[in-house]
Amino acid sequence: MKLNLSLQQAFKSPDLALKRAHIKKAIETTLDHVEVKTDSEIGIACVDHEQSHRLNLEYRGKDKSTNVLSFPSDIPEEVLPLLDARPLGDLVICIPVVLDEAIEQHKTAQAHFMHMLVHGTLHLLGYDHETSDEDAEEMEALEIEILAKLGLENPYQEQ
């Protein structure tokens, strides 16, 4: 399985060094864990509060910025065999929210960013924690397992 990654850093912070190789590894580990075998592509945009707030309001009706927004690809299934890689969609990650949450949750910014990558990628694959308690438990369990493979602690465990 090959992953094509498009990374746009519209917002950068000295408190979070983003390394393309680490980002790619987190996404590839997620895809491998849920047994995605096809070549895939994903877009990631790192944004500020203002962009996140605007997108969250426009697409989810929520009047605030948020840590990660997931926009799954809407390419029709019948077109996919014609493509070199399956477009999974795009993630929009609000770096200031990730940094604030990391402090609140007593985590490193890097660990929380990786969690948001895994979480968002699972959303792109159709997992949803807002539909039912069972779905939330399944998604959290997957996140814990994937993050462990990346050498990161359970993000839901109290620090």
Swiss-Prot record:
HAMAP family: Endoribonucl_YbeY (MF_00009). NCBIfam families: rRNA maturation RNase YbeY. One of its GO terms (cellular component) is cytoplasm. Binds 1 zinc ion. Zn(2+) binds at residues 119, 123, 129. It comes from Acinetobacter baylyi (strain ATCC 33305 / BD413 / ADP1). Belongs to the endoribonuclease YbeY family. PANTHER family: ENDORIBONUCLEASE YBEY, CHLOROPLASTIC. This is Endoribonuclease YbeY. Keywords: Cytoplasm, Endonuclease, Hydrolase, Metal-binding, Nuclease, Ribosome biogenesis, rRNA processing, Zinc. The keyword Protein transport does not apply. One of its GO terms (molecular function) is metalloendopeptidase activity.
